[in-house]
Swiss-Prot record:
Domain of life: Eukaryota
Organism: Mus musculus
Gene: Kncn
Tissues expressing this chain: Preferentially expressed in the inner ear and testis. Localizes mainly in the kinocilium of sensory cells in the inner ear. Also present in the manchette of the spermatids, a transient structure enriched in interconnected microtubules (at protein level).
Transmembrane annotation, as ranges: 13-33, 40-60
Protein name per Swiss-Prot or TrEMBL: Kinocilin
Coiled-coil parts of chain: none
Compositionally biased tracts (Basic and acidic residues): 110-124
């Protein structure tokens, strides 16, 4: 039961599905009262956006020569700045532990301030 379809007809059907998803998502979000209904509309919009990306990918690939760009993007690495104290003979393991303790004490102080009757909520 295979029905032959031309590439042009397939692209038109694909674009029609994207347009239907955008319209349906916009209408659902526009008339929704609850957050759950708005979330469903957002799912429709996200699916339509993905469909649009799939639709446009061959054109973008031909226009911007993505075969050279995508591997370069994949090779990017993010290296956090190492602190100046690494050169003073301290191991990075100790500095990471001290940084975690410092962050934990900051969080603990903040939580103490937020507690009812805590140190930061004293009334004078």
């Amino acid at each position: 039961m295979d029905i032959p379809i031309s590439t042009r007809d397939f692209r038109c059907l694909q674009l029609a599905c994207v347009a239907l998803g955008l319209v349906a998502g916009s209408i659902i979000i526009g008339v929704s009262v609850s957050k759950a209904a708005a979330a469903v509309g957002g799912i429709f919009l996200g699916a339509a956006g993905l469909g649009l990306l799939i639709f446009a990918y061959p054109f973008l690939k031909a226009r911007f020569n993505l075969d050279h760009i995508l591997p370069a993007i994949g090779n990017l690495r993010i290296h956090p700045n190492s602190g100046p104290d690494h050169g003073e003979g301290r191991s990075s393991n100790n500095s990471n532990k001290e940084g975690a303790r410092s962050g934990l004490s900051t969080v603990t102080r903040t939580l103490e301030k937020l507690k009812p009757g805590g140190r930061g909520t004293e009334e004078g």
